[in-house]
Each structure stands twice: as C-alpha cells, then as structure tokens.
Amino acid sequence: MGLIDVLKSFKSPSGREIRILLLGLDNAGKTTILKQLSSEDVQHVTPTKGFNVKTVAAMGDIRLNVWDIGGQRSIRPYWSNYYENIDTLIFVIDSNDKKRFDEMNIELGELLDEEKLRKVPVLIFANKQDLVTAASSEEITRKLNLDLLRDRTWHIQACSALKNEGINDGITWVASNLKPASKK
C-alpha cells in the first residue's frame, strides 16, 4: 500500500493541494522515504544536494507535493525558503546515529520555534529501525525532549525506509491530522 492508497481513505475537498515538507539531517533517509511513498526503487539512492519534489495525484484532483530538502549543514540555512503554506512537517531521524542526537535536537528545536511552522503538525520518522543498534522511538522521545511539546500536534513513528516498514502508519497519522482546507 502506497501513499495514494492511504490518502484515498482521507476525505478532503477536491482541488486541494497538500504540501508536505520533508526535513532532517544528512543521511537520515529522507529521499528513501520519498521514493517509497512514490513507489520507486530505493536500491540506488544518492544524497540530495538541493531538493527533490514529488507531486502525486491522490484522489480526484487532490495533489500531494512532497518537498525533500537536503540535510547537509551547508543546505540547512535554506530550509526556511520552503516554510510557506506547509500542511505537515516530516522530520526524519537516523535512529542509529546517536552521536548526532544533540545536533538533531538543535535543528528540530529551531524548526519548532519557527513562526511560519507554529501550527503545522509534525511527524517524526525514527528511521533505520531495522538496525539492531538503533534507538527506539521512546528513547528518541526522551533524548529530544519531545514530551515537553504541549502546544503542537506531533507524533513519532518508528520506521525503516529501506524495508518500507512504518511509513504508511506515519502517513496515515499525517492524513488524520491535516487541517481542513481553508475556503478562499
């Protein structure tokens, strides 16, 4: 079951464009998740040096725009160029890269403090759960102090992008937490 199938179950006014921003540190698995969502081969994924955008027709004339922005330190200052009109923020964490948890915490904290993203639901994919040394989603919740987030809708989802495990559960959460489209 791919992203389209999950979203077909989500009732939304026709003509809606759902914009998802996919962020995280380099090598977290963002592009692999994007490729899984669009049912593409994930065997030969290369690091994103700028951004990838996939537009997927979901149901009727509903369009999904998933923006995958590179996570290298040199690219992160440009993340703010993509904050406008975001329906959901997905932050991907390499659960096996425990040495970088402090860096992840800083970057996620800056995103959560961003005014343009203040009311945007946040899904945190705790990726690479297929590795035996990966931190659990509970451990990541503690390390990143996610339980302190009281003024925002958020969810952490354990996943393995490579094995396509947990991704649909996360996207189902995204679909159930989308705000109704505003009337123009």
Curated annotation (Swiss-Prot):
List of residues binding GTP: 24-31, 68-72, 127-130
Cell location: Golgi apparatus
InterPro entries: ARL2/3 (IPR044612), P-loop_NTPase (IPR027417), Small_GTP-bd (IPR005225), Small_GTPase_ARF/SAR (IPR006689)
Family the entry assigns: Belongs to the small GTPase superfamily. Arf family.
Protein name: ADP-ribosylation factor-like protein 3
Keyword set, alphabetical order: ER-Golgi transport, Golgi apparatus, GTP-binding, Lipoprotein, Myristate, Nucleotide-binding, Protein transport, Transport
Gene Ontology terms: biological process: cilium assembly; protein transport; vesicle-mediated transport
Entry GO CC: cytoplasm; Golgi apparatus; microtubule cytoskeleton
N-myristoyl glycine lipid sites: 2
Phylogenetic placement of the source organism: Eukaryota, Metazoa, Ecdysozoa, Nematoda, Chromadorea
A Pfam short name: Arf
Gene Ontology MF terms: GTP binding; GTPase activity
Species for this entry: Caenorhabditis elegans
Main function: GTP-binding protein that may be involved in protein trafficking; may modulate vesicle budding and uncoating within the Golgi apparatus.
PANTHER family: ADP-RIBOSYLATION FACTOR-LIKE PROTEIN 2-RELATED
